[in-house]
Amino acid sequence: MDAPPLHANLIPAARGTEPADLVLKNAMLFDAFSCSWEEGDLAIKDGIIVGTGRSYRGIRERDLGGALVVPGLIDAHVHIESSLLVPQEYAHLVAAHGTTTVIADPHEIANIAGKEGIEYMLACRAGLPVDILYMLPSCVPATPADVGGAVLDAGDLAGFPGRDGILGLGEMMNVPGVLGGDPGVLAKLVLSRIRDGHAPHLSGPDLNAYLLSGPDSDHECTTASEAKEKLRCGMYLFVREGSTEKNIAALVPVVTPYTVSRCSFCTDDCHADLLAHSGHIDRCIRTAVAGGLEPELALRMATLSPAERFSLPDRGALAPGRRADFCIVDDPRHFAVKETYSRGRPVAEYAAPQARPPVFAALRCTVPSRDQIRLFGTGRARVIGLVPGQILTESLTFDLDAAALPDISRDLLKLVVCNRYGKGSVGTGIVHGFGFKDGAIAASISHDAHNIVAAGTGDEVILSALTAVIRAGGGMAAVHKKDVTVLPLDCAGLMSTHPAREVIAGLDALSAATRRIGGIDDPFMYLSFLALTVIPALRLTDRGLFDAVAFRDVPVFP
């Protein structure tokens, strides 16, 4: 006998011959297929949408009085660890902002704890109001230049595809490995048919070769011209708006009725305080609309476009057979989420989050000595330059004497990266753009190897900040004069198992401390990317300065 049709038990409710569990009456429903609005009712049974129209009756009925109903929002690419929250706390926080699905790459924790880290994140996803679907970390470590806590080759990953919660292969950051035909890199690309890319500034024949190898999405575009070229080549465009990476304003012009099916929103890296105070994908919608994008196109980017890109036909639209994931909002331009439903239930009805205790060590290092963080040299020096609103850096040169650092008048500070895995290696460099006046910050979040990174106006305050992070077993610290503010992160030195409200309060305290230090907003997020060797142009690792364009170590003083 043939298998029964999908949702055969729901056919009577869909036909209206049996009552639905819930019918939302008198709603304005967003049609993600045509990017338009339709007045009507929404009928739900067993967590599935069974129909729209005017003829449905329900065991429970609710009159929305013309309120707008939008499919549940989808984040196309995120690293949950960057929120500083474990998945349970993260899910409850973003669900309140209309998000019901996130496509997450757990490569932060995988770089520290390997397969054990991935298993931890998978175990955290059960029973949440947000469906967390994971992309397997493809680059652990990010490049051969990085020394982290784990190495995952294709054989290590082979047992994950097909498991519940695993959707595909995460961002392929090792662009030189792809273009060079590295067998180990190519072996990973055949593990899944859904393969995310990572191709900052890649263009022309190299972009063609990268696409030919399998990755077909990118969230690293920072200019409209770059985005247009990648769309023309068939890539999916993830328009990013994170804590530091703010690309919506530059990329809105490329989103049209003709390209919107290939465009989605993502947040990539967002601290919990930004999520709580400003929002998640709902914030992306508001930002895009304020930048001139039609609300209906923005809504399509947040719903159906990512669902189709990731081959998720059970969500992304208010249509029969799809999950009853949706949010009720005030108007499409201001997009204030009043209520979120996940699988037909208000997210407020989901059980309070219960964090799983981590089972792996965070730090295996000691505080470096003053001699280890000294920098020697005189003359032309390579300096890492921050770029406001981006994780890209500039490769700058200054005439200076290392013994005279810091040079507050020219905004030149010392930057230090300490190996967290017990190897004892320490890299020292110079950074421009923080604007600190007096103090230092340090953190055990340092993409992607997550060594301990610090920047400050003097050796004493830098060492104080490093000491605070290491004594906490991982976390973030700010030092101003003798005042030390610390946010411990007890899960791998990346996340906290404490409630979101406590983490947000800790972040608020750190923000107050950094305001006393002076300088840019959210310096911790900028700091966390200064060791990321897969993003141009200049980086610092625990081995020293790294040219991320030439892909080689370079001296501070040539």
From Swiss-Prot:
Example GO biological process: adenine catabolic process
HAMAP family: Adenine_deamin
Cofactor requirement: Mn(2+)
Organism of derivation: Methanoregula boonei (strain DSM 21154 / JCM 14090 / 6A8)
Enzyme Commission code: 3.5.4.2
Name of the gene encoding the protein in the UniProt record: ade
One Gene Ontology MF term: adenine deaminase activity
Annotated Pfam families: Adenine_deam_C, Amidohydro_1
UniProt keyword terms in alphabetical order: Hydrolase, Manganese
Official protein name in the record: Adenine deaminase
UniProt-listed PANTHER family: ADENINE DEAMINASE, N-ACETYLGLUCOSAMINE-6-PHOSPHATE DEACETYLASE
Annotated catalysed reactions: adenine + H2O + H(+) = hypoxanthine + NH4(+)
Family: Belongs to the metallo-dependent hydrolases superfamily. Adenine deaminase family.
